[in-house]
Curated annotation (Swiss-Prot):
NCBIfam families: MIP, PRK05420.1. Belongs to the MIP/aquaporin (TC 1.A.8) family. It comes from Vibrio vulnificus (strain YJ016). SUPFAM superfamilies: Aquaporin-like. Gene3D superfamilies: Glycerol uptake facilitator protein. Homotetramer. The gene is aqpZ. A motif (NPA 2) lies at residues 185-187. Channel that permits osmotically driven movement of water in both directions. It is involved in the osmoregulation and in the maintenance of cell turgor during volume expansion in rapidly growing cells. It mediates rapid entry or exit of water in response to abrupt changes in osmolarity. This is Aquaporin Z. Keywords: Cell inner membrane, Cell membrane, Membrane, Repeat, Transmembrane, Transmembrane helix, Transport. A motif (NPA 1) lies at residues 62-64. Aquaporins contain two tandem repeats each containing three membrane-spanning domains and a pore-forming loop with the signature motif Asn-Pro-Ala (NPA).
Length: 231
């Protein structure tokens, strides 16, 4: 039970910290943190939680990561469903807390503001198509898993995995916020989309399918590039 609670709290922190920075601080007049700040916020949530709960649950915080680690031979199949349930619950609770805070500002409307939801077409920050969004999310998730598997490999320098993984997520956001508002994490997308409804839930399928597919590809890619070094 401890590891499931760790995943719940960890994903809560990721959604509250990352999406919270986007909703509350990104465009704050004069001192808003902007795209760079939001990207760093997401990376910092993973970095801090990796040190806090990595020894308890492995600090997945992401259904795609959980499935990718299973595909990479690092995780048991029987744990996939409870991990994903804990992650989604944590994300949804964080979305509710953030919605409560944001609603305290006069004129706030989750649907019209987007509430840090992920989208494509007219709901992409840069107006990118479904195809662009699909390719972006698959490739970003693939690279994320490759970095995770590499950084946590027993042959890698020890103690630096949280830094590498946190910086990787920051870089992913710097690249892809203009395209999809960056998901690579179905729990993160679900956690805010449920409070927007409408278009956000209609487009949510892509932010489950693409990250999971990308994570599976990342697991395959890491096996290909690391296999010859095992002996």
């Amino acid at each position: 039970m401890n590891k499931y609670l760790a995943e719940l709290f960890g994903t809560f922190w990721l959604v509250l910290g990352g999406c919270g920075s986007a909703v509350l601080a990104a465009a704050f007049p004069d001192v808003g943190i902007g795209l760079l700040g939001v990207s760093l916020a997401f990376g910092l949530t993973v970095l801090t939680m990796a040190f806090a709960i990595g020894h308890i649950s492995g600090c997945h915080l992401n259904p795609a990561v959980t499935i990718g680690l299973w595909a990479g031979g690092r995780f048991e199949a029987k744990e996939i469903v409870p991990y994903i349930l804990a992650q989604v619950i944590g994300g949804v609770i964080a979305g509710g807390v953030l919605y409560t805070i944001a609603s305290g500002q006069m004129g706030f409307d989750a649907t019209s503001s987007g509430f840090a939801s992920n989208g494509y077409g007219e709901h992409s920050p840069g107006g990118y198509s479904l195809t662009s969004a699909l390719v972006t999310e698959i490739v970003m998730a693939m690279m994320f898993l490759l970095v995770i598997l590499g950084a946590t490999d027993q042959r890698a320098p020890q103690g630096f995995a949280p830094i590498a993984i946190g910086l990787c997520l920051t870089l992913i956001h710097l690249i892809s916020i203009p395209v999809t508002n960056t998901s690579v994490n179905p729990a993160r997308s679900t956690g805010v989309a449920l409070y927007v409804g409408d278009w956000a839930t209609a487009q949510l399928w892509l932010f489950w399918v693409a990250p999971i597919l990308g994570a599976l590809l990342g697991a395959v890619a890491y096996k290909l590039i690391s296999g010859s070094n095992k002996d």
